[in-house]
Regions:
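Short coil/turn segments at secondary-structure boundaries
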Residues: 69-77, 90-91, 106-113, 126-129
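Histidine-centered, transition-metal-coordinating active-site segments
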Residues: 1-79, 83-89, 96-98, 118, ...
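Aspartate-rich (DDxxD/NDxxD/DxxxD) Mg2+/diphosphate-binding motifs
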Residues: 99-127, 135
Length: 380
């Protein structure tokens, strides 16, 4: 049995003053006794990791192509990549690693099937009931839909973990001048870093782009220069893998340099005081400009590629059709969502049901409900 006072003492030694300390948690909606050897945020992390919604991320594509192959990234693999980068940032900056990991594991739990086009379709279909946001739906999942405990609905996560996700769900409503806690900021940064680097990787793997095309971008040229200086000329496959690693390392290193410098000014202050001061962890101006160039290029060359646009149009048709059919015949939904339809507007209950589906299950439901003998979208 571990004395939790020693756990708090260990945090006091390892974490910076501006990190979120376990001893300062505001607790849970449903009070629970402390765990024998895990702090509150470690428990949150484990509850998210073992949730049904988290496991379903393995069946949702990161960038929807219709091809669920061994290589392709899913929301689950992306989430683990984000968590890995976020933990590195947290450890280096002496922030709370358990809280950071919990936030990273939760950040994509609310994503619907079919990638971002799935979110766009649900947003349109649900506009009369407030639209759809995967960040907001993640909170619905962990507070209501997950049913793992007899005493309450949801996972009963700590206030800080829920508040961190709430910031992501309501960014436009965030009070000006006050910044999110630092653990939230580095998860956002890790998500963006992983997203850009791995979209480059996937685009190269699928043949949508070549390294020569990418080399016109400043941040890619810089990464390639670093690789050649250290390793010389590499075969194409090794060069692609090295490029992804170097893009991540460049961005992480830049963020840490800026963060370490800014955090010197708040040494000794609490997490609340740092938020009140509005301190934000960002990339340097130079790298931020290069990242904007990269993201703009990827948007035009990859996300709007005619091959992917055709698949997404088919996916959008399927999801929109399912939404309409289930609104007309909600009795086709499982019991718990039929019950939700009695408590909520029917569009919200249908949207929640669809948002929880994997890509393959959505295809299956489309075939069953429309009685259309179509194959997977990879065949389009």
């Amino acid at each position: 049995m571990i004395d939790l006072r020693r756990y708090a003492d260990r945090e006091h030694l390892l974490l910076a003053s501006y990190a979120m300390h376990s001893r300062d948690t505001r607790g849970r909606a449903h009070p629970e006794p402390p765990h024998a050897y895990r702090g509150p945020f470690a428990r949150d992390r484990d509850r998210i990791l073992h949730s049904s919604a988290f496991r379903r991320l393995s069946g949702k594509m990161q960038v929807f192509t219709g091809e669920m192959g061994i290589y392709h990234r899913t929301r689950l693999t992306h989430t683990f990549e984000v968590a890995s980068i976020a933990r590195t940032l947290a450890r280096t900056l002496r922030l709370n690693e358990d809280l950071t990991e919990a936030l990273a594991l939760m950040h994509d739990v609310g994503h619907p099937p079919y990638g971002h086009c799935g979110e766009d379709v649900l947003g349109e279909c649900m506009q009369d009931v407030g639209g759809f946001s995967h960040n907001g739906f993640a909170l619905v999942i962990v507070q209501q839909l997950e049913q793992r405990y007899p005493q309450f609905n949801g996972l009963n996560l700590s206030y800080e973990t829920l508040a961190g996700q709430d910031v992501r769900a309501h960014k436009a409503e965030a009070s000006r001048g006050r910044s999110p806690m630092l653990e939230v900021q580095i998860v956002d940064a890790a998500d963006s870093i992983a997203y850009d680097a791995h979209d480059v990787d996937d685009a190269l793997q699928m043949g949508l782009l070549s390294i020569d095309e990418l080399a016109q971008l400043a941040v890619v040229r810089r990464a390639l220069d670093q690789i050649r200086a250290r390793r010389g000329i590499l075969p194409t496959q090794q060069l692609r893998q090295s490029l992804v690693h170097e893009l991540i390392d460049l961005q992480v290193s830049d963020l840490l340099r800026v963060a370490i410098e800014r955090l010197r000014s708040v040494e000794g202050r609490s997490t609340e005081e740092v938020s009140d001061a509005g301190l934000r962890l960002t990339h340097s101006d130079a790298l931020a400009e290069e990242r904007t160039e990269l993201e703009s290029f990827l948007f035009d060359a990859v996300y709007r590629h005619e091959r992917l646009m055709a698949v997404r149009a088919a996916a959008a048709l399927r999801l929109r059709t399912l939404f309409e059919k289930l609104n007309e015949t909600p009795e086709r939904m499982p019991l718990r969502f039929r019950q939700r339809a009695k408590e909520l507007p029917i569009q919200m209950a249908v949207g929640e049901y669809l948002a929880g589906m994997t890509d393959a299950f959505c295809d299956q439901q489309y075939r069953q409900i429309t009685e259309t003998p179509v194959g997977p979208l990879a065949d389009w």
